[in-house]
Swiss-Prot record:
PANTHER family from the UniProt entry: PC-ESTERASE DOMAIN-CONTAINING PROTEIN 1A (PTHR14469:SF3), SARCOMA ANTIGEN NY-SAR-23 (PTHR14469)
S-S pairs: none
Taxonomic classification: Eukaryota, Metazoa, Chordata, Craniata, Vertebrata
Gene: PCED1A
TM ranges: none
Family: Belongs to the PC-esterase family.
Name the UniProt record assigns to this protein: PC-esterase domain-containing protein 1A
Organism in which the protein naturally occurs: Homo sapiens
């Protein structure tokens, strides 16, 4: 978004508590967490940088950023779509990836989306209903929505945004934190693969459409009490880190994005972070602090009993909801495969319950050896936390951007237990309760074919 200041005072950097995370700290923050990332190729790069940062303190290579649908990336695996199917730039492209750490205490999954709400997204939500409940969902969809679905794409995008937030509110458990990543700024010349040659005349207006779409998505996410990370704001001065295609970004930008995202998540979970002094980022300038419609935040306490900290703490109005174009699933009996005992960690080699609706067929009966991953049919269970990261005592200030949130800061039992739309927030069912209310779709193509790794 663009903010105009009436004052002639020079701009000054905005102080924030953004932390430059090390791999060991990311491992602690996401210990026993299931992270789901949904979106386009930029969100795939978000997934890749997070997977890499969970393992080592290094940056993605240009080849890794450019790769699409590869069979394996940094110990992850391609579950469906990509090279297992057909590589193309159509709206039916699918790619599902998953990373499970060797310890079994970190699970990250990625679904490629070409539209924010669709029949395919309903299949993804169905899959998440049967499997372990996500602890963190990171989602964005904008560029495809505004460029590949006809003349009324903005109107359709607004309707689909409302639908997706309603469905996320219905499906995700109370313990899940959802972060909506706003679309990053585009270049003046756009040659990204999502924009077909015959659609190049749209490139000029697409930059303005993204700003408008960001406004609608942030407003709706905030009204549904979901978090918003304004990447358009944060990266508007970082043009030297944007690729020549006008859409994608280099490895330095994506590592900065990961730091922003993880700082946001840690703050929402109430996790104490290591405080190290950093100089101002030379490629990020922020406006002076001002009122913003999406400022404020809410916290979510960790999903297990012991206090989670990377270091010891220091002493001291919208339109009514749109109708759904796809029939919503009806309740059905609980799944035939009950969850494993609650003291079982998420280790490789455990099978994922087969679903009779896995009939979509890019590749029949796909499976991977057990040592390559872990089956998501097991609930995450708290395990002992790794020891705190040794480091210097907190000192100094950090420089970084503002995180825009939808709700004022306070400490409830869950991140979304707030008043919304003039009434009390409806309590979402937790995963154990939702097992009674699971549903099956009527012969709808699943989010992926075959079996989950393991």
């Amino acid at each position: 978004m663009v903010f105009c200041l009436s004052s002639e005072e020079p701009r000054r950097p905005l102080r924030s508590d953004m932390v430059h995370f090390q791999a060991s700290e990311v491992q602690q923050l996401l210990h026993n967490k299931f992270v789901v990332i949904l979106g386009d190729s930029i969100q795939r790069a978000v997934y890749k940088d997070l997977v890499l940062l969970l393992q080592k303190d290094s940056l993605l290579t240009a080849a890794q950023l450019k790769a699409k649908g590869e069979l394996s990336f940094e110990q992850d695996q391609l579950v469906a779509g990509g090279q297992l199917g057909e590589l193309h730039n159509g709206t039916q492209y699918r790619e599902v990836r998953q990373f499970c750490s060797g310890s079994g205490h970190h699970l990250v999954r990625f679904y490629f989306l070409t539209r924010v709400y669709s029949e395919y997204l309903e299949d993804v939500l169905e899959e998440l209903t049967y499997g372990p409940a996500p602890d963190l969902v990171i989602i964005n969809s904008c560029l495809w929505d505004l460029s590949r679905y006809g003349r009324c794409s903005m109107e359709s995008y607004r309707e689909n945004l409302e639908r997706v937030f309603v469905r996320m509110d219905q499906v995700l458990p109370d313990s899940c934190l959802l972060v909506w990543n706003m679309a990053m700024p585009l270049g003046e010349r756009i040659t990204g693969g999502f924009l077909l040659p015959e659609l190049q005349p749209l490139a000029g207006s697409l930059r303005r459409d993204v700003v408008e779409g960001n406004f609608y998505s942030a407003t709706l996410a905030g009204d549904h009490c979901f978090d918003v990370l304004d990447l358009h704001f944060h990266f508007r001065h970082a043009v030297q880190h944007r690729h020549r295609d006008g859409v994608h970004w280099d490895q330095h930008a994506h590592r900065h994005l990961s730091h922003l995202l993880l700082t946001h998540v840690a703050d929402a979970w109430g996790v104490e972070l290591p405080k190290r002094g950093y100089p101002p980022d030379p490629w990020i300038e922020d406006w002076a602090e001002m009122n913003h419609p999406f400022q404020g935040s809410h916290r979510q306490t960790p999903d297990f009993g012991e206090h989670l900290a990377l270091l010891p703490p220091p002493p001291s109005s919208l339109p009514p909801p749109m109708p759904f174009p796809y029939p919503l699933p009806q309740p059905s009996p609980p799944p035939l495969f009950p969850p494993l005992p609650q003291d079982t960690p998420f280790f490789p080699g455990q099978p994922f319950p087969p679903h009779e609706f896995f009939n979509y067929n890019p590749v029949e009966d796909f499976s991977m050896p057990p040592h390559l991953g872990c089956g998501p049919g097991v609930n995450f269970v708290p395990g002992p936390l790794p020891p705190p990261i040794p480091g210097p005592n907190p000192h100094g200030q950090h420089w970084g951007p503002v995180v825009h949130r939808g709700m004022p800061r306070y400490v409830p039992n869950s991140p979304y237990h707030v008043r919304r739309m003039g009434g009390p927030c409806r309590q979402r069912l937790r995963h154990s309760e939702r097992l009674i209310h699971t549903y099956k779709l009527d012969r709808r193509p699943p989010a992926h074919s075959g079996t989950w790794p393991g």
